[in-house]
């Protein structure tokens, strides 16, 4: 499957569909069946239950020898609790090497303080989850394919976002650089709120779209959310100024705000207006480099149409990973896992999903 054939819609969690009745669990356990606790199961019920439990155990199997070898090969730089020195302290029952801090006395492993801390599912399951993201699967289809609980996909995605924050820092394009802004509609509730405010003031409706500044030099790219209003000179310079090398050639559509970037970086300007390029074939369009990225970005975000706009930059960081770095998907998985092992980020499940507003 490719990203072109994996477009689906995931329902956005809302106060209405997330409402929890008192005393009733929010989500059904994968090991819970309508006939659980009843005597005399039918043959069909027994077969279904045995199959699902087998799936469950497969997803929660013990780490493979290769996974244990990988984890035990990671050498912590310091105690994740206090930053002190440490010594080896044998192995845990799972086979993972344990360490003990010489200063605070706490014990830990190479995974302590990372997104894999206190994991219940083998790290190897992340490979399939990441591949689904790279192939433009929605969270809903990924949860179904992986037989995960409804919140698992969102919980893991929050971990992916945490690891990728800052991944675009330091990206600088040079040579021939194409730029343009991509617009995403605000959700219906935000549009209605913006309309009410504009009607009260008697002006134009604003704040109904999110702007993303995009750039590419044909090899690398960047995607930076500028806000809910059309970026002016200051916002353009903030988005593009640190990400384009001086004296490069800027290929753009003549947007007025681009002039601030051109002047500040002494760029050569090559303008192709929308009137000029309208109706052109892709191979003839001088802005095809940036238009192609916009097209892929649109398809990617459409696969996750229920996303929270407050996390739009996180989604752009994930899209950056898809369109930059190693071309091979397995190399991207390797790249991500190695980043995750090295970053001390811990996100507790209880903090994300433990409390539901009534």
Predicted regions and their residues:
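Residue-level recognition of single "structural anchor" positions
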Residues: 2-358
């Amino acid at each position: 499957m490719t990203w072109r054939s994996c477009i689906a819609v995931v329902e956005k969690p809302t106060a209405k569909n997330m409402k929890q009745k008192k005393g009733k669990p929010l989500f059904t356990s994968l090991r819970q069946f309508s006939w659980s606790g009843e005597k005399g199961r039918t043959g069909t019920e027994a077969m279904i239950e045995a199959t699902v439990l087998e799936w469950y155990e497969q997803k929660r199997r013990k780490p493979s020898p290769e996974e244990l070898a990988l984890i035990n090969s990671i050498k912590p730089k310091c105690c994740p609790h206090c930053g002190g020195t440490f010594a080896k302290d044998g192995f845990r029952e799972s086979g993972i090497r344990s360490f003990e801090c010489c200063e605070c006395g706490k014990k830990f492993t190479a995974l302590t303080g990372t997104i894999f801390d206190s994991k219940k599912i083998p790290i190897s399951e992340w490979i399939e989850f990441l591949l689904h993201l790279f192939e433009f699967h929605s969270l809903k289809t990924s949860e179904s394919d992986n037989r995960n609980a409804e919140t698992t996909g969102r919980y893991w995605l929050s971990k992916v976002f945490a690891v990728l924050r800052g991944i675009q820092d330091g990206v600088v394009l040079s040579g021939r650089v194409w730029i343009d802004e991509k617009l995403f509609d605000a959700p219906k509730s935000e549009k209605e709120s913006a309309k009410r405010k504009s009607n009260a003031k008697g002006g134009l409706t604003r704040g109904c779209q999110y702007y993303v500044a995009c750039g590419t030099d044909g090899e690398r790219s960047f995607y930076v959310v500028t806000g809910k209003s059309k970026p002016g000179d200051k916002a353009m310079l903030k988005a593009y100024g640190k990400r384009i090398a001086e004296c490069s050639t800027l290929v753009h559509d003549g947007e007025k705000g681009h002039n601030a970037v051109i002047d500040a970086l002494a760029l050569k300007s090559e303008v192709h207006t929308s009137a000029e390029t309208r109706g052109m074939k892709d191979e003839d369009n001088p802005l095809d480099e940036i238009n192609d990225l916009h097209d892929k970005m649109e398809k990617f975000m459409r696969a996750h149409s229920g996303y929270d706009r407050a996390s739009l930059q996180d989604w752009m960081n994930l899209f950056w990973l898809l369109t930059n770095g190693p071309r091979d998907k397995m190399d991207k998985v390797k790249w991500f896992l190695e980043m995750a092992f090295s970053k001390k980020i811990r996100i507790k499940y209880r903090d994300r999903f433990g409390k539901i507003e009534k």
